[in-house]
Amino acid sequence: MAVQKILINQFLQLAALHPVLDVRSPGEYLHAHIPGAYSLPLFTDEERKVVGTAYKQQSRKKAIKIGLDYFGIKMRSMVEEVEAMLIDLRSLAKKQLSTNNDQPTNNIILVHCWRGGMRSAGVAWLLDLYGFKVFTLSGGYKMYRQWARSQFDTFWPLTILGGYTGSGKTLVLQELERTGQSIIDLEGLANHKGSAFGALGEKRQPTQEMFENLLAKKLHLFSETGTTHGGEIFIEDESQRIGALNIPDSFWKQMRRSRVLFLDIPFEERLSYLTEEYGIFGKEPMENAIIRIQKRLGGLETKMAINYLQENNHRECFRILLKYYDKYYEKGLAARETIPVLIKKITCLEVETKSNIQKLMHEKITAP
């Protein structure tokens, strides 16, 4: 068998069926990688640094010799690691009793490094020699990043799910997905709910690059399978910044030009929902979050909110915060183009997911 170098589109098609091995260093992988790829580093972070220094300060041949020293002692363990991985994947597929062709049924392996150079070529040679059928990505991870960024420039049929803070928009999105609708949960991809309090109860945020990769993969799934229910993708209304991350500029501009179905829920109902959702968190992280917005909230309101928090009067604390976020959200709505055309308000009596979805879908069908 011979190693085949393939272009990004074919690589992604095969990646839906077969494992992808990222042979870059652990640090490179940790920073960002192709979603779903497995880390099989040819060099450790320190070894990569040594090889790179030799290449720059001595010669290409010297760097290759140092790399071969590192590679030689790892050959057997790398082959065995890939063998074990394939066994685990096949076992998992059998347990899931999948009837689709979405599990590896042979020895096909996809390999990539940063630019599709010597690291992927070396590992691909080894795995091919052992008996695996190996494909490498032309241009490597760098080419994948170019492809990922191109996804954000593509037109997508977005419908924005709007509503003031505390409207339960994420719950609506999740229920829409369970019923077969196409959705993108940006806050889920970002591990952040979007406000100063958005990190509470969430895992650490991915890097900006990894966030973009995750979003690109989600979009690519829609282009591969075709969106359902009229080719519509529901996505929650967001500011461009979600915690420490930014929605890619071209995609965010598409969001701002898309129509909005706005869940208009009474203030007190939303306040009750927020009190229940955030009242479980400790005083210290809540106070830290309040302090982060004190300049915009104002000194008096900040002091009052913290006092209510210390007195365990969460409802009055959140009342102050919710008024602030309502004003903040209204400014964002006002900045949209052709507001009367883009925004359709849907009157809802409470934060109740299923009944609000019924109203949402009715408006979606009847709206021009």
Label each PLM-derived region with a short phrase.
Residues 1-35, 63, 149-153, 158-162:
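Flexible, polar/low-complexity N-terminal or interdomain linker segments that lie immediately upstream
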Residues 47-84:
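Aromatic- and Gly/Pro-rich amphipathic surface segment
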Residues 117-119, 159-178:
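Glycine-rich phosphate-binding P-loop
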Residues 253-260, 264-368:
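Conserved NTP phosphate-binding and transfer environment spanning the P-loop NTPase/kinase superfamily
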Residues 69-97, 104-137:
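Catalytic cysteine-centered active loop of the rhodanese-like fold, especially the PTP/DSP P-loop
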Residues 132-145, 185-190:
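A short glycine-rich beta-strand->turn/loop micro-motif centered on a GG-aromatic cluster
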Residues 20-24, 37-40, 184-185, 234:
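Short hydrophobic beta-strand that contains or immediately precedes a catalytic carboxylate
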Residues 178-253:
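Conserved nucleotide-sensing/catalytic segment adjacent to the nucleotide-binding pocket
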